[in-house]
Structures are given as C-alpha cells and as structure tokens.
Amino acid sequence: MTDLNKVVKELEALGIYDVKEVVYNPSYEQLFEEETKPGLEGFEKGTLTTTGAVAVDTGIFTGRSPKDKYIVLDEKTKDTVWWTSETAKNDNKPMNQATWQSLKDLVTNQLSRKRLFVVDGFCGASEHDRIAVRIVTEVAWQAHFVKNMFIRPTEEQLKNFEPDFVVMNGSKVTNPNWKEQGLNSENFVAFNLTERIQLIGGTWYGGEMKKGMFSIMNYFLPLKGVGAMHCSANVGKDGDVAIFFGLSGTGKTTLSTDPKRELIGDDEHGWDDVGIFNFEGGCYAKTIHLSEENEPDIYRAIRRDALLENVVVRADGSVDFDDGSKTENTRVSYPIYHIDNIVKPVSRAGHATKVIFLTADAFGVLPPVSKLTPEQTKYYFLSGFTAKLAGTERGITEPTPTFSACFGAAFLTLHPTQYAEVLVKRMQAAGAEAYLVNTGWNGTGKRISIKDTRGIIDAILDGSIEKAEMGELPIFNLAIPKALLGVDSAILDPRDTYADKAQWQSKAEDLAGRFVKNFVKYATNEEGKALIAAGPKA
C-alpha cells in the first residue's frame, strides 16, 4: 500500500494544502463511477456510450494550444532549449521566474482544499531512461486519461514511487494578469525544467498532459545520447524492428498497424543502447470517420475503459463518428492492451533496422519510395515535409506545404540538429537503412493507393527493395527502384505518371525551391551547411 500521508506531504511541498481527500491511482472501476456519477456539470461530466466507453467534452480547446506554451528561462535552459526567434519561429517561448511563480500560485491555490486525484505512472518503457510522472487533478476523467496514456506501475513499483516530474492540472483556473505579463492569453501550459513541473490552466484538452511529457522526454533524452522520436514502431516475427515517422495524416498509425507484425507503439518512442521503447502505456487515436471496416483494431479498442473526447453522442447513447461539428480532432484514449497484436509484457524491442519517413506530397513530385543516403536521411528528417490539398475559393485545390522539423517540431525542446545527430548515430550503429515513402499524390491527380503503399512497405520490411535495380530521380537525386513485387511499376518514377514530363519538371523545380528556402534556417552552422548538398537542387 502507498503511504497516503507521504503523498499529502509531497503535495504540501508543492504548495497544495488542506486537501480534503487524495484518491490515489484509482482503478478503472472507480474512475468509471467517478466520471459518470450524478451531479457532475460542465466539462467534468462523462457520458456513457453504447460502446461501453465514456465520452467527455473538452470545451473550446479541442486540440493543443501551442500559442499558450512557455518554458521558464533560467541557467539550465538558457543555452539548451531551442528558443523561438525571428528566423526560426517555434512554440518554445521564454517565461521569467516571477510569472512562473504567479501561475504556480494560481494552480496550487485552485487545487488546495479540494478532493484530488493523484495518478503516478511512467513515461518510457526503458528502466534506465523512463521518467516517473505524478499527475495531480481535481477532475476524474483527466485522471482516467493519464491512466490510459502513461505506463501503469505495478503495486511493487508504487510502494517506493518517487516522482521525477509533476503535472499540476488546474484546467478550471485562468490567469487574470496575462496582459501585464506579456502572455498570449489567460490560458497557459508552462514548464519549469529545473523544478521539474508542468502547470496547466484554462484548457481542458487531455492531450496537453500527454504531449507535455513528450516535450520533457525530448529535452532530457537526447542530452544523454538517447533518441526521442515522434514515430510509430513495430516488430516482425524475426525480431526486426521498423520505425515510421510522419506528420498527421501521412499514414503513421495505419501503416504500422500490420497483422504480420506486433505493435510497439503508435506515437512516441525512444532509442537507447538496448533498442526501441515506447514512451506510453496507451494510444490516442483520431476517430473522425472511424469505421470497423477501415480501422478494425481502433474500432474494437473503443470499449469499457476507453475515453472518447469531443465526439457527438446520440440520444440513445450511440456515437456518430462521422459528425465533426465539435471538432475534426475527435479522439479516443485507451490502454495499449486494447489492441491485440502488441509486444508484451513491455512495449520495447531491439534496434531498428528500417527507418521510414512518411510524407503525403500533394504537389505530385516525390516518388512513392526512395532509399536515402545518411546525409539525405538527416536532410529529409530535418525538413519534415508533408503537404495537404486545401480548396481555394475558385474551386482550385492548391497544395499547402508543411515543414515540421524531425516530423514533430511542435514537441522539440532542443535544436532539431541534436535529434538528427542522435538518430543517424543510432542508425549507423544498428546498420539501419532509411527510406522516404510518399503516401500522397502523383501525376494522375489521384492519391497513391493504399495497396501500392502497403506493397512498398512490405518490400522495405522483407528486404526485397535492396535487391531491386535502382534509378535516380533528377533535381532531388533520389535513388528509386525500377520494379517491386506487388507494386504497379508505372508509378515508381513519378515522371511516368504525367502525360507530359515537362509538367513534372516545373512542379519539381517549384517544390525543390521550397525545400531550399526552408532549409536556410539550419545552415547557421558548419554541419547544417554540409547537408545542403544532400537536398534538392533548386
């Protein structure tokens, strides 16, 4: 049994006093009772659905609030954090000690004199590199969310649990002094890396707790040579590990969920001396337009103990997954064991030998697959390119490019080159190969079929792509296979998908120019300058 007096003393040390009751690491059964009990109002209220899962609403914040993210500027962080600047804008905005203290007072005052849920868990399935996290909240479903998403400790581990990091969620409190303090709004998500505390105020979005700890892992791990990656990962029958990087909508979750392979995790991983390990104990999947036919694993994971966010629940308790009226970013969190085909008992495996960068190129320029050199690996990892098709007022669909460093710029706490260095070092030590896979469009105007993309992934994973005869794509100087089993050969060279190759040429020159322009921000040191040669020639 955990000593609750010890927990209360630790809360007092944080500035949380006169707690009415501590509900410590509640069971799923208890959480279900707490979040559906009569009398709950507003965003605290959970609704039971016919799936067996409880649904909650997060209010106006149906996604993360990057404009309200701050890190305390101090001796520890001033030369390590990748601070936002005019030349390279990002979400790491500095906060002074006085402002931090006033926010901490607001949150601790909000949590004092209340009945609190305290959930202890781990971030990271590696004993050496995990962080012991304590989450303190007055809201039952927020405790449920973190129980789903972090790694659940054993009774034995809880006996001597010492938190390395504390998340204090004060979603009910806002900051009245934000204007004088020069902040973005009355809401805040603030981190103090010296005190090892995250404060949340004003936003009820569950993902702030998950991605907050990801940002923390992204700070501490690379500084000791351990990879911290925004990727999914799976392992084959022979123990061969693949990792899939990609921004939202590129196929990261879909392509790593493979009946022939066991899932390590779907979103956040580390790479240490033993191999690849999941940071999380659960999954946080998008549910918009979810169907059993298209994504059976996720669909079946939505049952008792899963927690739905911002979905529309009909009068009879059924869920309308096609209704995006609250947000397109409808979500579900569930413990990872709700998926059958997973690595057990610990979400970790050996070193990755295949590293796949997924991009959905709406310009129709990039090949469906290319093999990268070590220099190209760093270049395309730092570029983190994808593109969406957005309709314009005249009905023309224009591609909008996104360049997100390391396929996860929103969560990087250190300079992107540090993640690239660790990744390539780990890859070289493991003899891993890297591939750029375009799940987007080509000259036909259609999206590359999921059948062809799965065929490409199979060829990478079974090694047959290594035996393929290779050609080279000009401008980008990418190595592309001439034929792959189970893949339509007519699409492998994107130039062949255009009625007129000159069309590809002009689009390729346009896209190459965008890559070059984006990469300027990395050419501020010698290493960055050296990588320019690995990129496209504008």
From Swiss-Prot:
Matching InterPro entries: PEP_carboxykinase_ATP (IPR001272), PEP_carboxykinase_C (IPR013035), PEP_carboxykinase_N (IPR008210), PEPCK_ATP_CS (IPR015994)
Entry binding sites for ATP: 211, 230, 246-254, 295, 331, 447-448, 453
Protein name: Phosphoenolpyruvate carboxykinase (ATP)
Record organism: Haemophilus influenzae (strain PittEE)
Cofactor requirement: Mn(2+)
GO MF annotation terms: ATP binding; metal ion binding; phosphoenolpyruvate carboxykinase (ATP) activity
Alphabetical list of HAMAP family matching this protein: PEPCK_ATP
Gene Ontology biological-process entries: gluconeogenesis
Chain sites annotated for binding substrate: 64, 205, 211, 331
Cofactor note: Binds 1 Mn(2+) ion per subunit.
PANTHER family: PHOSPHOENOLPYRUVATE CARBOXYKINASE (ATP), PHOSPHOENOLPYRUVATE CARBOXYKINASE ATP
Quaternary data: Monomer.
Role summary: Involved in the gluconeogenesis. Catalyzes the conversion of oxaloacetate (OAA) to phosphoenolpyruvate (PEP) through direct phosphoryl transfer between the nucleoside triphosphate and OAA.
Keyword Protein transport attributed: no
Enzyme Commission number(s) from the entry: 4.1.1.49
NCBIfam families for this protein: pckA (TIGR00224), PRK09344.1-1 (NF006819), PRK09344.1-2 (NF006820), PRK09344.1-3 (NF006821)
Pathway: Carbohydrate biosynthesis; gluconeogenesis
Binding of Mn(2+), residues: 211, 230, 267
